[in-house]
A protein has these predicted regions:
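Metallocofactor- and cofactor-centric catalytic cores in central/energy metabolism, strongly enriched
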Residues: 1-153
């Protein structure tokens, strides 16, 4: 008897928690980007939602959720700068590939009218990819990086 199953894909997004009290408009921006990003995941897989991670504790919680669900793959959306402590606890105990999605929302900045929250929320592809890749390498994790400009969400 053939049983149809779907691959289980853990999905989460990260941002530096220290930015949020300084720039509260980033919260709805990041929530909207993350919701749009999740919609790009095909319904041919079972999405396990780890949420938006801004602290080590939230990363650990996402990792617990991924382990409990026995995910086959993890996809991480980098919303803005974040350190690897936002990522590593979520994937450290998993033996699955990790895909870092590092895209900025807008292709061309309007420099004359760009403020810090706009830069951090819509124009900044994460500069911490190197740190995260190095940590994934040290942890022996299979990984890939997708980087560039989002076509659309």
């Amino acid at each position: 008897m053939l049983v149809e199953t779907k691959a289980k894909v853990g999905v989460f997004a990260i941002a530096l928690g220290a930015y949020l009290p300084q720039f509260p408009t980033l919260v709805p921006e990041f929530e909207a980007q993350y919701e749009a990003f999740k919609k790009t995941i095909p319904d041919t897989v079972e999405l396990v939602d780890g949420g938006i991670v801004t602290t080590k504790e939230l990363s650990m919680k996402a990792g617990d959720k991924f382990r409990s669900a026995d995910v086959d793959l993890v996809i991480l959306q980098l919303l803005t700068y974040a350190t690897s402590y936002n990522m590593l606890p979520a994937v450290r105990d998993l033996n699955v590939p990790v895909v870092l999605v590092n895209v900025q929302k807008r292709k061309t900045p309007d420099y004359a009218n760009t403020d810090t929250p706009t830069w951090l929320g819509e124009l900044y592809a994460c500069g911490a990819v190197g740190e995260m890749v190095a940590d994934l390498e040290r942890a022996g994790k299979r990984h890939a990086v997708i980087t560039g400009v989002a076509v659309s969400y």
